[in-house]
Amino acid sequence: MASKDSDVRCVKCQSLKPTTPLTGQDRCARCVAINELKPWISTCNINPCYDGDLSESNETIEMMDINSCREDTPSDAESETRFMPFVAHSKQPKHTSKNPTKGEIQYFPVEKCKDIHRVENQSSIDEEGKQCWICRDGESLPEARYCNCYGDLQYCHEECLKTWISMSGEKKCKFCQTPYKVNRQLSLKRGLPGYWDRDDRFVFIAGFIGMGTILAGWIASFFYLLVVLCGKYFTYKDVMIVVGGLAIIQVVGLMFSLFMYFQIGNLLRQYINYMTETNIDPLRT
């Protein structure tokens, strides 16, 4: 028959455990240990009615505490997503409460401002005003518009546009691709371009003198041939003089043409462009 002490049950877990006679406790050693750790256990949300071995109770409590802390800790991916820098342009969702409870963390979606470049451009336009898109000068801008561009690209000086067309060779707007109404007219009122140096002027003038000399030789040979052929008497020597003269003029003219092409061809094109007056009719006003 079991002794009286062995029949005593723990008032907490009802296990057959003898009480401690010195202190008079009516709980087993396991329940006494749990009771001492009760404040710490309550913070970790651990069930105090653990049926495991007493020797493993402390380790089990520690493992449960670690697992509970891991559940409350956000993952790396969530932390990277949530803790993104807050942008001034981001908007707060409508479903979020205005007065969050204490300890509650609210995360707001980060939205990139799509119109930041447009806003900056618009502010610069408002500050600087109207400007020519070629020279960036806002003085004496004409009211005429030469293409279908709007905004800051519609303003342009006529002289700036003429220079741009002559230098680039384009005959339409590079933004809206609208063809310019360009009228070219050759004018002999201008002299040599002022941006030519002394060497350019000398080569250009010498080239025209050479062309005039060749043309004069052709004309003289032609009239001499007419005089010889129309005469009643002409010798073989007269015919050879005419043929030889024409051959020499032909060779000299060919060589001079090559010289003109390689030496003053660029100068001749510059002179033609300089002598040509370019007028651009406005597309709208």
Swiss-Prot record:
InterPro entries, per database record: Znf_RING-CH, Znf_RING/FYVE/PHD
Zinc finger region(s), RING-CH-type: 124-183
GO BP annotation list: protein ubiquitination
Residues that, per the record, bind Zn(2+) 1: C132, C135, H157, C160
GO molecular function, one term: transferase activity
UniProt topology in membrane: Multi-pass membrane protein
Domain of life: Viruses
Pathway: Protein modification; protein ubiquitination
Cellular localisation: Membrane
Residues noted as binding Zn(2+) 2 in the record, renumbered to the chain: C147, C149, C173, C176
SMART domains: RINGv
Residues annotated as transmembrane: 202-222, 239-259
The UniProt record lists the keyword Transmembrane: yes
EC numbers on record: 2.3.2.27
Regions of this protein lying in the Cytoplasmic compartment: 1-201, 260-285
Domains as described in the record: The RING-CH-type zinc finger domain is required for E3 ligase activity.
Record-given protein name: Probable E3 ubiquitin-protein ligase IE1
